[in-house]
Amino acid sequence: MLLGEQTGTTGHFSKISSSFSALVAHWRSYRHIHRIALVIFVLLTIFVLERYRSALASTFQTSTDPIAVPGGNSAAQDNNHYEPYPEANQGGGGGGGKHEGSKYEQMTPEQLLELSQKNAGNSTLGFHAIKYINMKARYDREDAMALQAYMSGLDIEDAPAVEADEIDPAGMPPTHRPGRLRVGEKGCWRAHANIWSQMTRHRLPPILILESDAAWDLNIRSIMSNLNTHFIDFLNQINSTAVHDPSYQSPNNHNVHGSPSYSDNGPIKPNPDDPWLSEHWDLFSIGQCFEYSQDREIKLVYDDESVPAGKEYWGKKMGKERVIRKSGGITCTTAYAISHTGAAKLLLRGAMDLDNPVDLLIRRMVMSRDLVAYSLFPPVMAQWEYIGGIGMAERGAQSDINGGKHRDTPEDADMPGWKDVQEKATIWQTKGHHHDVAFERMALKEAWTEIMGEGPEKLGESLWNPETGD
């Protein structure tokens, strides 16, 4: 072989080297374009990952449904719980979110209680939501709700009432007492049942349900915050245990609000994610208009500066105090909290036999102890009505359930009540038959002073023109 003559192998590598050199030269000539393309690719990848992160996480996340293990108890069954409250992790209500064990395990009992009290006085009073039921034509009640919520810092949601023209006998449950309920009472029951049904379907945390004529104290948030610690004490005092939970795959699952707040070996602990410890009750009434005597001795009395002194609890004179008690059966559904277990029970009872108005159904279930229920005396909420003699009674505006007259006030109506309006700077008062009401600062009565920033003496100038008499 002559010097300088290429062998086959040498020629092959020479071609590879030439190709590689050409590739490098190509890359160098277009390197800026390649870099831009690479940057675009990286940005698109980040965008796609961020956009679909939740979906990807749920795809690869281990299921939280119970693992089916035949026979007996097992670690798999103990550690994998069905989550009945998917909405609870979205916030709101009692602190908003799943109560993971590590979340509070470093906190002292005092810190836990302080956080529970804070959440019990939040904008939904520690509940998942506050819903009020209102007829679509009652704009006056809509406005009264808005004013109270505005002044007291509450976050409230409207729940449509069921109107008379929406009631079809074919869609009503059976009853052993045909003709017992008026159409308005059927609609009232159904409006409450719609909320119970939603809670049962979605296994929602407790909701506070209000009638649209509910009234409360201007300082309702601090009142409920103060109540919270005493309510926990009350549950401990009566050795409360968690109620039966029949939700799917969970007859004894009490992780519905996160870590259970109860313990078989110790006292009930505060749960900031569920300040009212709703696994211990079905119904908690804070606005009944009457209460029966049954179980009245199962109670806890505590100091509350917002309660005017002088009320009587079954013959015993009280100071500035409030009573937490085991309910003896309520009348009126002005304001009550309901847990998902209570919602399911009430939904079932009405579906089986709709033989009474909604508050009497509740009363019967409480008195028969089918509902685990607690209440307050005096209640922290009550019904309002218009001051007499201003023309609203003539319209039938004092009650929806009994049916209004649906006519305007006659031009020649006698209306002496407007003198009271001018003196008191309010058109609202608590209903006369609510003898147990004890507001220190009823929000609606304080509305003119709070919102206008002036006393009753200025009201006349706003309502009446002294020159024209209008």
Regions found by a protein language model. Name each.
Residues 2-210, 214-470:
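An acidic/histidine-cluster motif and surrounding catalytic segment
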